[in-house]
Amino acid sequence: MNGRFAVPTAIEPACAALALALACATLGAQTPVVQSDQRLRSSVEVTVVTATVRDAEGKLAVGLPREAFEMFEDGKPVAITQFTSERVPLGLGLLLDISESMYGRKIKDAENAVERFLLNLLAPTDAFFVMAFNHQPRLLFGWKTDPAGVHESLGRLYPTGSTAIYDAIGAAIPYLDRRPRERAALVLITDGADTASDITLHDLRPALVRSDAFVYAIAIDTPGTQAIAQKVSVPTLSEITNQSGGRTEVVRDTADLETATANIADELNHQYVLGYSSPTPGDGQYHSIRVRVSRDGYKVRARAGYVAARRNDSR
């Protein structure tokens, strides 16, 4: 395949074995943040779920008490043993498509949106990493909390090559698993369909199910997309994002990328984190999860299920 781009650190293309083995608006100074010693992470004993709640008007619902929530595993109610509506520190991964079809204004608008997201819309307590991808994913920088080098790294990108979305997600998930913060989210920005991955969506699904990260996609679906790219597949992106509790947002103009990333940041800034003790801990099996608000008109997005870690699992 033609084309490479110069960045400091490279990641080999994701492969099926990897995938199968892996299974905000700007923050105000008054925003409460959960202290770093509060560990809100899943373990063999406790399953932790992050949830986004919207009211009947579609607005983010904030300030709901624990008593307003109900949780179910495999259709059976479970008692909520951990709960916070305060902002829990976030580990964010960002995947930026730099295939040939992103040339020109698209890549410039995308770079500006990414830079604003990372430098202005995250909290000082958050950490982030960025991968760029065409027919293979490349790590621009690993986990960091400071803005140093972000602008320069993005500015060196040059769109070329084809699009390997599944490989990029497969390469990002291990970083999310080793995140230095409690919550996890992955944001994908792309203007095309996958044309070059070594793995398939089928190969990627086990890794997505095992991950507790909210996955978001911003699909650039501009009129008259160049013939060099297959049109972005919104249904495929939605299949990837929806099961995680995330979503896919479509923009018709790259000038709207900043609004789209701000909407995602706003969600990440107003989430609930809930935990419960599974009735069947450590069995290594898949279990469905449902989170609901007992009051009328509220809609909850959370991951659809999880694979329980075995008690002898060393991960």
Tell where the protein language model's regions lie, with residue ranges.
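N-terminal secretory signal peptides that target proteins for export/translocation
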Residues: M1-I11
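Scaffold/interface architecture of coatomer-like assemblies
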Residues: L27-R315
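Compositionally biased regions
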Residues: G3, A16-A17, A29, S43
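Bacterial N-terminal signal peptides
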Residues: E12-G28
